[in-house]
């Protein structure tokens, strides 16, 4: 009987873990439209600089303005934002990566919604991405 209890206990634990994974995966898929919306709005060619700056995470905004020695609204106009179609979205916890046909962006979930932590990023293989806009 002890063996049955242990086996049943393992099954219960496995079922709980499997259920938690399904719930967590479901949460990621539910967040995907919000992540995509933030990324594509930031990259839209017609987006005004103020809108782009509002979509930056607070620490990224501060870092970007300090690096550029200018207001975000002035400096963001010089950043090459290639945009394009969404190719993939990866969400892990409160962070995300959106790959567009012309750019890669990184986002974080804040109390105000999904915000950009890095944009205009180029892959460097095994090295970290090289980004024109990035936070600490």
Question: What feature does the model see in each segment?
Answer:
Residues 36-40, 44, 50-90:
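Short solvent-exposed beta->alpha transition segments
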Residues 12-14, 39-41, 55-63, 108-109, ...:
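Short, intrinsically disordered, charge-biased short linear motifs at domain edges
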Residues 28-31:
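Bacterial signal peptide processing site
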Residues 2-17:
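Bacterial N-terminal signal peptides that target proteins for export
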Residues 23-26:
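C-terminal motif of bacterial Sec signal peptides marking the signal peptidase cleavage site
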Residues 104-135:
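Short beta-strand edge/turn micro-motifs at domain boundaries
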Residues 81-107:
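Exposed beta-strand-loop-beta-strand "reactive/processing" segments of non-cytosolic proteins
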């Amino acid at each position: 009987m002890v063996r049955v209890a242990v086996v049943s206990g393992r099954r219960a634990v496995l079922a709980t873990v499997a259920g938690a994974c399904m719930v967590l995966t479901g949460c990621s898929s539910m967040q995907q439209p919000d992540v995509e919306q933030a990324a594509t709005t930031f990259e839209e060619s017609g987006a005004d600089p103020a809108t782009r700056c509002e979509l930056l995470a607070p620490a990224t905004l501060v870092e970007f303005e300090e690096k550029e020695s200018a207001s975000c609204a002035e400096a963001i106009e010089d950043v090459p934002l290639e945009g394009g179609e969404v190719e993939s979205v990866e969400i892990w916890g409160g962070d995300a990566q959106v790959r567009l046909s012309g750019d890669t962006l990184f986002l974080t979930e804040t109390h105000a919604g999904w915000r950009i932590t890095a944009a205009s990023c180029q892959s460097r293989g095994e090295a970290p991405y090289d980004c024109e806009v990035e936070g600490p």
